[in-house]
Amino acid sequence: MKSMNRMKAIRRITTLVMLFIIIFCFAVTGFDMNVIIKRGSQAVLFIKRMFPPDTGYCGKIIEPLIKTVQMSIAGTFIGAVFGLFTAFLYAGNLIKKSYVRIVVRVIVQCVRTIPVLILALVATFIWGLGAAAGTIAIAVSTWAVMARIGGEDIESLTLKPYEAVTAIGAGKFKAFSRTVIVELLPGYLSNSLYVLEANIRHAAILGYVGAGGIGLLLNEKISWREYSRVGMILVMLFVAVLVIEGISTFLKAYLDGRIKRNTTANVIISVCIMVFFVYSLSAVKDVSTSKLGIKVVGAIMHGITHPDWEYMFMTGKSGVMYLMLETIAIAVAGTCAGAVFAVILTLINSRKFIPAPMAFIGRLVVMAIRTVPVYVYGLIFIRVTGPGSFAGVLTMMMCSIGLLTKRFTVAVDNWSMAAWNACKCAGTGFIARLRYVAVPELKIQFKDAVMYRLDVNVRSASTLGLVGAGGIGAPLIVYMNNYRWDAVGSILIVLFVVVLLIELLSKCLKRIH
């Protein structure tokens, strides 16, 4: 009884502390509803400039759009393959030598900390401008993400079947491929498809730093204020995301066993995937490094390992610590605001609560929200709030709404409604069912999704300075362009520590709740 009361007290204190942190983050960013009410129409006016889109420009969008899809597929495939091999070294239950596991985990976490836009900028220094740099950046980012996800999935597996097969005389490799790989692969491939969907959106903004794809065209048209053509680019990007997501949904259903599998279907799907991958490799042709590129790699490594300690601990609003605090505040406030709207949208987005046709329309709306690149949202909200972290909060909110609504909807779609239906038959009201049935049964999945999104948003918020939306992104890009790698190292080290602390916080919250 005492332990139960103690846990309840810990949960209440944790909840109060989290509420205080959230309120503090909103205050740091200067969030003001009055500004949104008075100047919200400016965002609407900006969006109106994009519509109706310039349909005559469609023909010039197709080629860079195809290049964007190629970059995403090739980068995801390469990163996922290397990530699978790294996952075996990442997992604690496979590698008995702790120093190997520690080194691998540190490298993976360091790379995972770096936003893909920053990876793309580094890649352009080494391999030059173009789609090859973007593909390599996506591959490296995917490798780090999938190595971590795969390693954690392996740790959750039981190795008893593997041990049993080796005990009866089977070779270790054969036993491993017939037990661990068979159990791991469906979930790993499904996660790879989620990453592919995200990479399509990442690839759409890499052109901002000259890393190829439709982002080059989008950045150009925004700079020239040809907003009707910007609208056409976004429409075409939405169509591409819709097609990719449709294919991804089919493949996930196939992997999960919801669609009947057979040998013929396996062969056809495998051949199609390989054909798409080989075709996508044309995006990375003529990859070569110059002597300057090799020097840049050396300078980057030297700068990161020899950071500017004075700059790292400098006080004032131009110091790393304050800018990182602002970045964290943007990420926390944006994630929380996005989560609130995502819950509301989930209720009108799931077939379990509303008719299927209405849910389909809702999902299209959410997909459209997810399609818009992050810096386009930044430009829209700067018209409302002016430059600064307030615009960053609204930008992170919109980015969070799209992805959290999808994660929440997946959780609801997989939710057994036995208790919900029983309470409904007993005459319990809708609000009461939400409070006493839905919330207790779904809160863990929702909380995990929010913490994952917060982790992503901290890295994403570190690039918002590109469009004047606050955070540490502006000095990070400036120092990279000026080859101040010691200052870049200072920023990345602090960013790494912050991401690591968020991960530890997430694990602690799982234990408490």
Per-region residue spans from a language model:
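Alpha-helical membrane-interface segments at transmembrane helix boundaries
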Residues: 62-70, 104-111, 197, 219, ...
